């Protein structure tokens, strides 16, 4: 069994009120993405599972390959779904998790309109469907980028910084901010029970082929035995989180979070620069870190935020904690799972 699956099993033993899911139908949208697929894995590996999991995504071929282990399981279902269009069907989902989003810099640079539509139209269509079909709770997977640029040493959930709304790169944080507000509007006007998770930069093994975020490129290089190419100074200082810890946090928010609240998701033991991240991955992979000037297109997708360190006191009050191991351990688990 891979280290990743062992990590999944640890989360399944966490003290969560799994009984809330008993007999329920759970929809995970964006199920083939890094975070969405990990949520599906935890829900399916849970030994106390007595619910149905619906994994929704645009690419059926990718989904069937990613979730091949569950193909014969009667409680697993794939649902072909593009969140930019209204959700079809008449299934009554008790819990909807919206983890659908284009979060790669190449999308920010080349398809900012589509990024905004997926975030804003996506939550609209899912909320409308949930309202019509008696949904119990909606979990929106947002981003720590909603805080914009700030001067605080560590960021809690109470205040927000500057986002340049005239910069197309702001398509991602601006649309996530708008989607959060829209979620609160559904709560106020229609009584929807909604909770929000704001993940920091998240890493793990099963990212998509099109993901060109720094961590994904670094891990690809290490797996292939190629030197890691750093295309910036690498001095941006960030909170990071292993995807299994992130998915665990989101399940704590789903099952124990207070309605109408947002929670930062980060590992306080994993605050490092991008350069340091590259060096850790290079050491694991036995390769070197080199540097190269980014192209104009790559530069357009870069975040201008230099420091993004998150306070997770609020999340920890729900009883969440990371699984045992250092950041290096979890990066190694990610790399070994892909070899």
Q: In which residue ranges do the predicted regions lie?
A:
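NAD(P)-dependent short-chain dehydrogenase/reductase
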Residues: 150-159, 181-238, 243-254, 279-284
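Active-site helix of classical SDR
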Residues: 171, 175-178
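C-terminal substrate-binding subdomain of Rossmann-fold SDR/epimerase-dehydratase oxidoreductases
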Residues: 224-339
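Conserved glycine-rich Rossmann-like NAD(P)H-binding loop of the short-chain dehydrogenase/reductase
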Residues: 48-63
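Conserved Rossmann-fold NAD(P)-dependent oxidoreductase catalytic core, especially the SDR/UDP-sugar
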Residues: 124-169
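NAD(P)H-binding glycine-rich loop region in Rossmannoid oxidoreductase-like domains
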Residues: 80-118
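N-terminal Rossmann NAD(P)H-binding glycine-rich loop of SDR-like oxidoreductase domains
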Residues: 26-45
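Amphipathic terminal alpha-helices
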Residues: 1-20, 50-51, 325-339
């Amino acid at each position: 069994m891979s280290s990743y699956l062992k990590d999944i099993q640890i989360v399944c033993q966490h003290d969560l009120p799994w009984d809330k899911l008993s007999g329920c139908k759970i929809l995970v949208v964006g199920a083939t993405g890094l975070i969405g697929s990990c949520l599906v894995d935890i829900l399916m590996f849970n030994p106390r599972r007595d619910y149905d999991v619906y994994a929704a995504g645009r690419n059926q071929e990718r989904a069937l390959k990613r979730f091949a282990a569950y193909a014969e399981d009667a409680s697993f279902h794939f649902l072909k779904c593009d969140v930019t269009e209204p959700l079809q069907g008449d299934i009554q989902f008790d819990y909807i998790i919206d983890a659908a989003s284009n979060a790669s810099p190449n999308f920010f640079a080349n398809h900012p309109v589509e990024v905004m539509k997926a975030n804003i139209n996506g939550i609209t269509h899912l909320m409308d469907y949930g309202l019509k079909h008696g949904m119990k709770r909606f979990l929106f997977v947002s981003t720590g980028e909603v805080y914009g640029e700030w001067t605080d040493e560590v960021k809690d959930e109470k205040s927000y910084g500057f986002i340049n709304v005239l910069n197309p790169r702001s398509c991602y944080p601006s649309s996530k901010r708008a989607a959060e507000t829209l979620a609160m509007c559904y709560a106020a006007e229609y009584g929807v029970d909604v909770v929000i998770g704001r993940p920091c930069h998240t890493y793990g093994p099963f990212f998509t082929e099109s993901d060109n975020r720094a961590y994904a490129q670094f891990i690809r290089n290490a797996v292939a035995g190629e030197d890691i190419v750093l295309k910036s100074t690498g001095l941006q200082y960030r909170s990071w989180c292993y995807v299994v810890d992130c998915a665990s946090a989101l399940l704590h928010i789903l099952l124990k979070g207070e309605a109408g609240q947002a929670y930062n998701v980060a590992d306080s033991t994993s605050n490092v620069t991008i350069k340091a991240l590259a060096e850790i991955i290079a050491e694991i992979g036995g390769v070197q870190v080199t540097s190269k000037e980014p192209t104009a297109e790559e530069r357009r997708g870069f975040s201008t935020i230099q420091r993004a360190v998150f306070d997770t006191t609020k999340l920890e009050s729900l009883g969440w904690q990371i699984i045992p191991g250092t950041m290096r351990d979890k990066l190694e688990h990610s790399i070994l799972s892909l070899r």
